[in-house]
Structure formats: structure tokens, C-alpha cells
Regions:
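Non-catalytic, mostly N-terminal accessory regions of nucleic-acid modification and defense proteins
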Residues: 1-114
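Conserved S-adenosyl-L-methionine
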Residues: 93-172
Length: 172
């Protein structure tokens, strides 16, 4: 996926101080959603409510050399980390729970989903699909060529989290 310039990280992190970073981030999210239909309506757009300094500081933190030069699925792992923290901080109300990654990994390793359809009737944040992708990658198989994923979720917030999780991990 090649993003328009105004949606690219380098553009946002180097945005002049006199420009509204909150509005620029909202525009970037809209451009990404237009480019990647799977993310339509899933990305957050409330950036204008945050202090510009906070937004710029966060962009700079993720712009450090260590992150830019990291190998593997670093941003996917970062996303999972914050998703887990979000779930543990009380976002599991209403009977919705994040299945611990260790349990999801165990399930995937037991069923060994190497072809066909992977269906999760309560997919939550999409962890089963992500770990299926990890499993297939470890086997030297391209996930999108080996399996088709289907998920169902009653909570709209979880649906958005799942779509973002899949996108961050390169799964469609």
C-alpha cells in the first residue's frame, strides 16, 4: 500500500509547528481509509481534542532510529501491547473480553490452521487471525494464500479494533 503524502508518517512528523497537527492527523486517517477500504470507519479521528505538543511528542517517540530500523512485526507487536493494556484497564465491560494472547497462541498451535477457512464467531480484536498469520509465516506460508478469515463481533468498538489489528499485521 502506498499512501498519499499527507498520510505518510514522514510528512506528519515533519509538519511545521505553525500547522495544526490534530487536523493533519484527522486528514491522514481519512486518506488512509479512502486508500484501504477495509479500514473505512475504523480509524480514530478525535485528534483535535488533544494538545498539539502531546501529539507531536508521540510522533517523535515513534520516529526514533531504533523503531525505524527494527526488524519484523514491530508495529504489530506494539499495537498488541497497547490493545492488551486497553483491555486490562477496564475496557472489558458488557461481557466482552480479550482472550489472552497465550491462550490464542495455544489454540492456534493445537488446530494448526494451514489451509481453508478460519472462522471466529466472537473475534473481538482479531487475535485469532493475527496468531494464525504468525503460525503460517513460521511455516513459510503466505497467510492470504493459505486461509480465508471470517469473524463476527457484536461490539462495534471491537470490530474497529479488529480491522485495525489486521491492517497493522498486513492481513486482509
Amino acid at each position: 500500500i502506498f499512501l498519499p503524502e499527507k498520510a505518510q508518517y514522514s510528512y506528519l512528523v515533519n509538519l511545521p509547528e505553525d500547522q495544526d497537527i490534530g487536523k493533519a492527523l484527522v486528514e491522514a486517517m481519512e486518506l488512509i481509509e479512502a486508500q484501504v477500504p477495509m479500514l473505512s470507519g475504523a480509524l480514530p479521528k478525535e485528534y483535535t481534542r488533544f494538545e498539539p505538543k502531546l501529539l507531536r511528542d508521540l510522533l517523535r517517540i515513534f520516529n526514533r532510529d531504533a523503531l525505524q530500523n527494527a526488524n519484523g512485526d514491530v508495529f504489530g507487536r506494539i499495537y498488541e501491547y497497547f490493545l492488551n493494556k486497553f483491555a486490562m484497564s477496564g475496557a472489558q465491560e458488557g461481557g466482552e473480553f480479550l482472550t489472552p494472547p497465550s491462550l490464542v497462541r495455544l489454540i492456534v498451535n493445537v488446530i494448526e490452521p494451514d489451509h481453508g477457512i478460519v472462522f471466529d464467531p466472537a473475534c473481538g480484536s482479531g487475535g485469532m487471525f493475527v496468531w494464525t498469520g504468525y503460525f503460517l509465516n513460521e511455516q513459510g506460508t503466505e497467510p492470504s494464500k493459505a486461509v480465508t478469515i471470517y469473524g463476527q463481533e457484536k461490539a462495534e468498538t471491537n470490530t474497529r479494533l479488529s480491522r485495525m489489528n489486521l491492517a497493522v499485521h498486513g492481513l486482509e
